[in-house]
Structures are given as C-alpha cells and as structure tokens.
Amino acid sequence: VSDVRNVIIIGSGPAGYTAALYTARASLKPLVFEGAVTAGGALMNTTEVENFPGFQEGIMGPELMDNMRGQAERFGAELVPDDVVAVDLTGEIKTVTDTAGTVHRAKAVIVTTGSQHRKLGLPNEDALSGRGVSWCATCDGFFFKDQDIAVIGGGDTAMEEATFLSRFAKSVTIVHRRDTLRASKAMQERAFADPKIKFVWDSEVAAVKGDPKLEGLTLRNLKTGETSELPVTGLFIAIGHDPRTELFKGQLELDDEGYLKVEAPSTRTNLTGVFGAGDVVDHTYRQAITAAGTGCSAALDAERFLAALADGEATEPEQTQTANV
C-alpha cells in the first residue's frame, strides 16, 4: 500500500490529460491511470481533428493526445499505462487498485474513463470482430480495399467512417434506422456527394452472417417488417457510445444511461472528493474541446477541495470565483 497522494486521475483522453496538466501545475503531483488499451482515449482512433482550436491545418488525433500527455508529464504528472480494477471511493481516503493488485491511496479522485463503442448486441457480432466487423474505420479501413462495406448509424461518426472508408472500398452502404440523418449538415453533404456511398433507410441489422469471416447482413425494414440480404465483407458499427462506469456502480451516482452524475456547473459527484469529467459525464456534446474543458474544471474543483481540507474544512467549499484561465 502506497503513501496517500493528493489526487489520482482514472482515465486519459483530453479530459484526463487536461486534469493532469492543471493538477500538476498546482504541484499536486497527480497519478494518472491512462488505461492499458485505452490510453489517450477515443481520439487515438481518429484521423484528422479539424475542430480543436489552435490548429489551423488540423492535427491527427494521436498526435494531439501525445502533445497533451507530454505537457502534463512536463509539469510533473505521473502517467501509468495501466487499468484500474477496483475502487473504494466512499471513505475520506480513496483507494484505487491497479491490475498488479497494488493499492494506491488518495484524498481526491478525478474520473475521466470516457466511453466505449456501443454494440448491436447480435449473436456472431463478437465472434466476427476483427474478421470483418469493426468499430474503427481509421484502425481497420485499409484492410477492406476494393470490398463492399456497410456502415451502421446516422450521426457524425457514421458519416465520418463512411467517407473515410470510401477511399479504400468498392462501395459503402450506410444503414440507418430512420429516414433522416442526425449528422451535422457538413457531414451529411460530404456523404451524399460521395459516389461510392449509398443509403438504406428505416432499417436495422437483424443478423450478422459468416463463418469464419463476415459474408453479409440480414436487414429488416422497420416500417414494412420485410427482410433483405446485403452481401458485405466489412461492417463498421457507429451507433453511439456507452460510458465506462462499470467500476463505479454502487458507489457513484449514475443516470439511467450509466453516465456519471455531477452537480453542474461543478464536476462534483455524490461522493466528497470525487470529481467527473469528459465523455463519462457528457452525453450531449462529446467533443474533444468540451472534454478538455471539463477536465480543467475537475482539476480546479479538486484543487479547491484539497485546499479546504488542508485548512481543516471537512466538506467541499462553496463555489467561488476563480481567476485561473
């Protein structure tokens, strides 16, 4: 069992790294569990990030995360590419257990575990993962050169995946359960203008077929109930995300969808000394810049909490104006 630290950050990505940067600059010496597989968060799986302010020409997702990570490290954050397997956040001193079984203790914890890709929940889906079924076009798109591919979803991610895949694929079919897209106007127009992309509306995937590799999909029209076959060798699923909050069930208050509840506008959770930021909290905006913003807020909230503790106040201080920018 280690000494008691000021703050432990569980998770990385823009929220975790920004929280690490701010707490490190406040000389709190944060320990950051970046995640073994998920270090860097969802942006590690994106290509060009064109909407993060300050990068006129855009920046690659992994490069942006690498920059943020290095910046946090430069100011003294301790970054560990490891997962957390258990937590006890209920006491005054919080405990966090890593995969090696080492128990780390801290006065404050910031949760930035992010979210993961939602699955269709069909038999065969997991079995064919990596054999035609994927959740990441930028990771796997290259393997589908000159093949027929389906993309499931109607939001920005689905359009982004489809337009990216059209560079490699012979054809891309977007299957959406409604007859209009949720994606932004710019993303829609890009997809509609692409000669390789076609749409199947009002439909869902009823079955994922193939053994040992993906051979096709059975689609069900939600208005008529009719089924049809779509022969594809690639399936990219882009139907949203589920927050990574499994670890915190029974301790931290979650909403109906499993997202961490915080006392807005602060990042405080229902447990004293525990704060939440990034996609694990946010199912509205889900942008790199908003995640970074809440990571900053969580760090400032934790900083104030620790200052109040040092002054002998047992509870969290009231909201105060801050001059930090």
What are these regions (language model features)?
Residues 40-41, 119-120, 159-160, 182, ...:
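Glycine/Thr-rich phosphate-binding loops of Rossmann-like dinucleotide-binding domains
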Residues 13-15, 115-117, 156-157, 282:
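Residue-level detector of alpha-helix initiation sites
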Residues 159-161, 271, 280-325:
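A conserved FAD-binding loop/helix module that cradles the flavin
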Residues 3-75, 147-148, 153, 159-185, ...:
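Beta1-alpha1 glycine-rich phosphate/pyrophosphate-binding loop at the start
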Residues 69-98, 103-106, 166-264, 304-325:
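A Rossmann-like FAD-binding core segment of flavoenzymes
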Residues 20-21, 44-45, 121-124, 162-164, ...:
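Short amphipathic alpha-helical segments
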Residues 1-10, 26, 31-32, 38, ...:
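FAD-binding core/adjacent interface of flavoenzyme oxidoreductases
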Residues 121, 126-143, 239-286, 290, ...:
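FAD-site-proximal beta/loop scaffold in flavoenzymes
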